[in-house]
Amino acid sequence: MKNLAFCLSLAAGAALAGAASAADAKIGRTLAGQCQVCHGIDGIAKIPIAPHLAGESEIYLQTQLKAFRSGAREHEMMTVVAKELSDEDIVNLAAWYASIEISVKVPD
């Protein structure tokens, strides 16, 4: 019985930890205000050298932001911007840009 109670408490703790670190796209949208000059609040790049972010996977976006933050990937602007982001900021930003649905119209 003690083992069952212990396992249940571990499971509950893991569930609470997951809920605390769940991505929040609304917070990400607020944070994206600093990204909008280059990447757009809608994730569609506003300058030629910036990539579109709309619809990219959360994992990809998180990986790239963490790489910029750590210096594993370098870019004059992104390295500086990413250094100021917490893990939670990165998760929320990735959730925002990943949540944007894009559609493509193929020319006739």
Question: Residue spans of the language-model regions?
Answer:
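Gly/Gly-Pro-rich "capping" loops immediately C-terminal to redox-active cysteine motifs
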Residues: G43-R73, T79-E84
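Positively charged n-region of N-terminal signal peptides that target proteins for export
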Residues: M1-A5
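Bacterial N-terminal signal peptides
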Residues: C7-A15
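Electrostatic cytochrome c docking/interface patches
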Residues: L16-A32, K46-I49, Q62, A67, ...
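C-terminal capping alpha-helices of c-type cytochrome domains
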Residues: R73, K83-D108
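The canonical Cys-X-X-Cys-His
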Residues: C35-I41, L93
